[in-house]
Amino acid sequence: MNFQEAWEKQPMSKPRIEKVTVNMGVGESGDKLLTAEKVVSEITGQKPVRTLAKQTNPAFNIRKKLPIGLKITLRGKKAEEFLKDAFTAFTASGKQLFTYSFDKRGNFSFGIPEHIDFPNQKYDPSVGIYGMDICVTFEKPGYSVKRRKAKRANIPAKHLVSKEEAINYIETIYGIKVEQE
């Protein structure tokens, strides 16, 4: 199955990136969370949202509803530009993307252990090193039918993004080799 020919023949079948979600679990609030906010906003160009602890854990000195992490959702051109930088950092850390990182709808996740692997980031001893998880969600044109308020309809199975399509898209657009399990 050649996806490139199918995408040229039918442009509505070509997948696109719906959103890129960046998650950073700091594990504690205070100064460490504030510096992590600065780091992640510098990398992404957007202000992060704080995530709260779901339960109390006295061993780690965490109380329920205490901010302990950050998340940012990127869409459109910002998401594509960030993903290029993220793949640069991912390959710089010597990691590989495997097929088991993709779900059946083509969405995938990967982690970056050190933020200093990103372009234009330097190590600062006062800041430290932060890692992050990056989740990429795919869709095809026409998904607004599923989200709209009036005359909402389901997307047929043939129009959903498959795992193979997403892998092919990542390999052709970003030049990342996806390894078999």
Curated annotation (Swiss-Prot):
SUPFAM superfamilies: RL5-like. Pfam families: Ribosomal_L5 (PF00281), Ribosomal_L5_C (PF00673). GO terms for cellular component: ribonucleoprotein complex; ribosome. Coiled coil: none annotated. Keywords: Ribonucleoprotein, Ribosomal protein, RNA-binding, rRNA-binding, tRNA-binding. It comes from the Archaea. Belongs to the universal ribosomal protein uL5 family. Part of the 50S ribosomal subunit; contacts the 5S rRNA and probably tRNA. Forms a bridge to the 30S subunit in the 70S ribosome. This is Large ribosomal subunit protein uL5. It comes from Methanococcus aeolicus (strain ATCC BAA-1280 / DSM 17508 / OCM 812 / Nankai-3).
